[in-house]
Amino acid sequence: MTRPTLEVPVDSLDSAVLAAPFATRLELCDDLPSEGWTPKTSLIERVRAAVDTHLVAMIRPRFADSPLTLTLESFIANKRVMDASTQEIKSAAAAGANSVAIGLLQADGHVDMNACGELAELARSLKLEVAFLRTFDLLADRARGMRDISALGMKRVVTAGVLGWDAAISTLEQRIAVLLSDAMNAAGAASAKALASGKLNASTTIKSAHANAPEQPHIPLARHAVEIVPGGGVRASNAARFMSVSSHLHASCRRDGVFNLDEMRRLHAVMNSAQ
């Protein structure tokens, strides 16, 4: 299995400092209870001064009239959103972030390739990795979405393996099945890119990197597939099941709206035991 990684979303310096010893990455955002917005530059600077952990800045501009609903319409690009996102990416880089997470969509339910491509190009010019937000779960076609974010060169994507934002609408087993399909789509998309660029022999095949996942003998080897990062209700109690799909997890470890250090420790222990 690939070395496990844990991404923890935080919206304060205190929670960042508590999570840092256990996290591979900290996703910095503002107002986590509303699923997060672009963090203030001052938060990135203070966390950067306090910890050495890889920092991801969520890029989700907030305006006085921003809708709080977590629907497709809330993530559609326009000039105001693009102007703000551009400045926020520049500010995040200057403040010490290592990555940004973006996820702008079109009204037809597909990835906004132009908007995301422009922001990703800017981020990479500033030496930032680029990831895709959980807006992936709002897409009309997950297979096409995976091809799209692969074409955009996304490093990883956070997804609950559901359609929509409410992870509770599906059983754990249903989510695992969707995530497995996402992982195979990611491998297929990466392989297609490699074949197109002449970097992969069409006869090369792969096996799943995870012992509990089904073998897929006809999928070409994909060394640079988008990393599937299960998120949405990930806990120590179910982490092992999610890790049957991916060794990368996204968990806030919050109880009653507050970061819970005991849950963080339990989750970290489960992930370490899976190595």
Q: Model regions: which residues?
A:
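Hydrophobic faces of well-ordered beta-strands that scaffold small-molecule active sites
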Residues: 4-8, 26-28, 55-59, 100-102, ...
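Catalytic domains of carbohydrate-active enzymes, especially glycoside hydrolases
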Residues: 10-31, 95-96
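Catalytic cores of alpha/beta
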Residues: 14-18, 65-91, 137-151, 219-220, ...
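Glycine-enriched alpha-helix->loop->beta-strand junction motifs that scaffold or abut catalytic
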Residues: 22-27, 51-54, 96-99, 125-127, ...
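Glycine-rich phosphate-binding active-site loops on the catalytic face of alpha/beta enzymes
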Residues: 27-34, 95-107, 154-166, 245-264
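Active-site-adjacent beta->alpha loops and helix N-cap segments on the catalytic face
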Residues: 32-51, 106-124, 139-144, 163-183, ...
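Glycine/small-residue-rich loop that forms an oxyanion/phosphate-binding "nest" at active or ligand-binding sites
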Residues: 42-113
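C-terminal alpha-helical cap/extension of soluble enzyme domains
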Residues: 62-63, 67, 180-275
